[in-house]
Amino acid sequence: VDAISPGINLEPVFKLLNDPTIIKVFHACRQDMEIFFHLTNNTPKPVFDTQIAAMVCGYGDAISYDKLVKQILGIEIDKSSRFTDWSQRPLSNTQLNYALSDVTHLRKIYEKLKKQLRENGRETWLVEELDFVTSTTTYMIDPEKVWLRLKVRSGRPQFLILVQAIAAF
């Protein structure tokens, strides 16, 4: 699905994402959840985030998809198209193949991580992490706190007060 294709109807995708009987598997889903929240005022549920599951299983705090695929499946993923111009249409065959390879292994990774979580008795740990990521309150913007999302390099109180006021505006 080319989500930014002119005139595309994303309703079938949103219907799938909101189907509570289908587990949606992502890797590092937080930005996706934020986008879905701002588009639909909701987040997909249930979800399984392979990056969060990998953290719970001991693969590190923020393992990349290609490293996770390499560690669990022993497969190298070509990431050479990662920084190409994805706004340019039509997408090249190289970009399409990259996009396909970026999701091809999700099901196998999901199955292996699910098994590891069960064997290690850590399924509830994952549920707690995913509850936060899929909670709509996680993505609600509080104007009084939005300034905390900015990377401010100054610790001067007057400057911070000004940044806070501008951000809330």
Question: Which sequence ranges carry the predicted segments?
Answer:
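Conserved DEDDh/DEDDy metal-dependent 3′-5′ exonuclease domain
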Residues: 1-116
